[in-house]
From Swiss-Prot:
Annotated SUPFAM superfamilies: NAD(P)-binding Rossmann-fold domains
GO biological process: fatty acid biosynthetic process
Name of the protein in its database record: Enoyl-[acyl-carrier-protein] reductase [NADH] 1, chloroplastic
Alphabetically ordered keywords of this record: Chloroplast, Fatty acid biosynthesis, Fatty acid metabolism, Lipid biosynthesis, Lipid metabolism, NAD, Oxidoreductase, Plastid, Transit peptide
UniProt function note: Catalyzes the NAD-dependent reduction of a carbon-carbon double bond in an enoyl moiety that is covalently linked to an acyl carrier protein (ACP). Catalyzes the last reduction step in the de novo synthesis cycle of fatty acids. Involved in the elongation cycle of fatty acids which are used in lipid metabolism. Required for normal plant growth.
Binding residues annotated for NAD(+), in chain numbering: 91, 98, 155-156, 202-203, 252, 272, 302-306
Biological source species: Oryza sativa subsp. japonica
EC number(s) given by UniProt: 1.3.1.9
Entry similarity comment: Belongs to the short-chain dehydrogenases/reductases (SDR) family. FabI subfamily.
Amino acid sequence: MGASAATGMQMVAARPCISASQGMLTSRAAVSRIGRALSTTTGFATCPRICYSSPLGSSKRSGVAIRAMSSESGPQGLPIDLRGKRAFIAGVADDNGYGWAIAKALAAAGAEILVGTWVPALNIFETSLRRGKFDESRKLPDGSLMEIVKVYPLDAVYDSPEDVPEDVKGNKRYAGSSNWTVKEVAESVKNDFGSIDILVHSLANGPEVTKPLLETSRRGYLAALSASSYSFVSLLQHFLPIMNPGGASISLTYIASERAIPGYGGGMSSAKAALESDTKVLAFEAGRKGKIRVNTISAGPLGSRAAKAIGFIEKMIEYSYVNAPLQKELLADEVGNTAAFLVSPLASAITGSTVYVDNGLNTMGLAVDSPTISS
């Protein structure tokens, strides 16, 4: 994780200045009582010190200016603390995607990490972990290595063993693995750990992603929705019973859900639109049923191995760099840090939202690198 993660996972508390010029606060005792009440109800780790000041320097001033100051002792700001929390991250198969970055951010905040890896990629992933090939990218801000407590085989296209077709059961890429449908994985996690607090969906696949929508088959279109959007519904459906109240779930989406991105085809744009719509519905249902928050992160393009299947990911990254308000490289860690915030108590009132982490590209309605504009 980048250096920013070491200190960047903190939200600096604002310092409001409240005037009492109307005589609403007439004594320091009253102010102290209010200060104590605020520190109790907000749940801040450090009680703010209430400082009294008179900018005019006059003892005749009737009002009292109040400024909340952080204590000189103890941690500054609002640290993201996920100690004692357990996260299951579905869709981690290497060390260069958003799923991995989210796992690192949650681990850096203290969470216990479980991952679900696509069955055909399981052997390579576990072997790479065991041989230390990921050790450099496992490094956390404190110098330790992210620990993945357990890796589960997972294919989120199938809800239960009854859904798996015979040709998949006999496929050699699935040989030696068992209990990898969504229902079975949820049951395995329950048997192994009892419960989780955080569920992350980092899954997407469109077998015809390089085809224009007008050339996409029904089978390819539905496959994209099944793997990229319904898989989130299925995961939450099966994991919700073992999620602790107050927990959170997040997924990853893309701006193609609402804008035409030529080349991002095969029904993938539709799948992302469905994912964002489902996020709102699931936020209501999971919130009422299990007190679970549900959000999605609309991340900018990243040159991960999975994204290279699109065929023009490097051009998408360059386009983003040139046209986004923030002309800088988008780091996977920035998405990871956003995820850590969204699943933390600091985001306890945020649910059903699509949060953009793309250097602001989603705000643009005109490509500034267009020859028409540049000329």
